């Protein structure tokens, strides 16, 4: 991966998020459930400054609820505990420590081997480099007064375009939450309150578009599973739903953009919220 300049030379984003937490006409339990099951692009500053208005309630930042979040940043430090690692990640607005558990049976032995020259020996630690960019997905929690990302999925970033794209998503969603932009899905979600998706004119099934079928299939497959060790591959979706892989890939991209699923091991495997 190419070497980049310090993150704060590029980053000026200080806000973001998908949902406006103010009540709107017609809002209710279904809208609350939608927020809980939606991935929100944020900055680390938003995570650190978020507050709980009520005990055990959702975290709120910039007029929006934060449940599952994603953010990008630079790895500043790696602490290897063989069975898990702690990554210190900074994005120009703040710094946070994220723990990732290893699934590799050889990590206990490899943890004492520093022959790689990087100061850490486990297989999970060698997936990351100090100074490299990563994207983090997970549930926002707090333990002992400290913000944590639970069930964290951490993906190395190979292209700086992904960092810029994330910043644009944060700006867009912050604008929606603050009322400066309209929610793009608002007109679709207000269609009798039945669907968040625009109807697929090419759909020939009984009332379900490929987008909806893929989301329902992914949710069913991911129920009770851990995103660190399980994902739904595109070929499985294609074979199970009798859809061509191009259609599945395009739908997965749309669902990712909408915050309902996210890529895990690579861009061909997804986990549903």
UniProtKB/Swiss-Prot annotation:
Chain positions covered by the region annotation Disordered: 1-38
The entry's DNA-binding region: 69-157
Phosphoserine carried by residues: 27, 122
Signal peptide from the UniProt entry: none
Entry GO CC: chromosome, telomeric region; condensed nuclear chromosome; DNA replication factor A complex; site of double-strand break
Predominant location category: nucleus
Key words of the record: DNA replication, DNA-binding, Nucleus, Phosphoprotein
Skewed-composition ranges (Polar residues): 1-13, 29-38
Gene Ontology MF: a single term: double-stranded DNA binding
Name under which the protein is recorded: Replication factor A protein 2
Gene behind this protein: RFA2
């Amino acid at each position: 991966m190419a070497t980049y300049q310090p993150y704060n030379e590029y980053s000026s984003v200080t806000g973001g998020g998908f949902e406006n937490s103010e009540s709107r006409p017609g809002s209710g339990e279904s809208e609350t459930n939608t927020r809980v099951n939606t991935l929100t692009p944020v900055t680390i500053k938003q995570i650190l400054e978020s507050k709980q208005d009520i005990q055990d309630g959702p975290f709120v930042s910039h007029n929006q609820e934060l449940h599952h979040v994603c953010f990008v940043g630079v790895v500043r430090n790696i602490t290897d505990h063989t069975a898990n690692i702690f990554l210190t990640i900074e994005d120009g607005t703040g710094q946070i420590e994220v723990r990732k558990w290893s699934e590799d049976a050889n990590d206990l032995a490899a943890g004492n081997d520093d022959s790689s020259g990087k100061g850490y020996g486990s297989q999970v630690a060698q997936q990351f480099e100090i100074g490299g960019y990563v994207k983090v997905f997970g549930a926002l929690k707090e333990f002992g007064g400290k913000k944590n990302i639970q069930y964290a999925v951490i993906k190395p970033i190979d292209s700086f375009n992904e960092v810029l794209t994330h910043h644009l998503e944060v700006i867009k969603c912050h604008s929606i939450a603050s009322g400066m932009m309209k929610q793009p899905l608002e007109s679709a979600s207000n269609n009798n309150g039945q669907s968040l998706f625009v109807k697929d004119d090419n759909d020939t099934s009984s009332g379900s578009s490929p987008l909806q079928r893929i989301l329902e299939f992914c949710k069913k497959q991911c129920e009770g599973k851990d995103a660190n060790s399980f994902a739904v591959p595109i070929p499985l979706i294609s074979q199970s739903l009798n859809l061509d892989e191009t259609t599945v890939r395009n739908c997965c991209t749309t669902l990712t953009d909408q915050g309902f699923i996210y890529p895990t091991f690579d861009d061909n495997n997804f986990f549903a919220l």
